[in-house]
Amino acid sequence: MSRLHVDSVIKSFGGKQILKDIYIVCETGKITGLLGRNGTGKSTLLKIISGTVKGDSQYIRSDHKVLINQMDRKRRIAYLPQHFFLPKGVKIKNLIPLFCNQENTEKLFELELIKPLLNEACRNLSVGEKKIAEALLILYSDSEFILLDEPFNGFSPKTTAEMQRIIKEQSKHKGIIISDHRYHEVLDISDEVYLLSDTYLKRIKDFKELQQHNYLPKSI
């Protein structure tokens, strides 16, 4: 078992503190859910962990290796952002080997969810199809830890259920942190759940705590 250890994360924008003394651990074999209202800093936290944004303070390590730059994160952390990142003119089948080892490349080529997209360039895909392709490339990548920012956004119930199944399958040998406003889908598959609220990250033990912290209405 490997551990991604995130500690002492602080981040401010324009004098306003977004994240304060954040601590979170992700282990291979587990899915960690990250919940919070819009604008609380969930995406910023994932960007700091991925190395695309620098915190005012941060301490991030994978097992005994402190992660300082992008090279340190190579093959350790893969990040699915909310924005599209794949090159528009390249066919999906040609992108898969760039992200995945031989074994996972073969698995992806046989996966029903992506089969219809293999011979298409990204520019020809719908918004939903692009999200499917990008999510699968990240999930099946060589990285040990996966960060997913709004992976279910825009998906049909059928596609969401299939993506949940794949996330759970990949978590058997990877550590996954997932953030999505569709909290039911996150809670359904998460082994541990954290709530980001008022700049702090709180470990959530049961559904009632989400109500106590005013993330969910008391009537639910």
Annotate each PLM feature.
Residues 4, 19-21:
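Conserved structural motif at the start of ABC-family nucleotide-binding domains
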Residues 50:
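Helix-to-loop junction immediately C-terminal to a conserved catalytic motif
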Residues 54, 64-78, 214:
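ABC ATPase NBD coupling module
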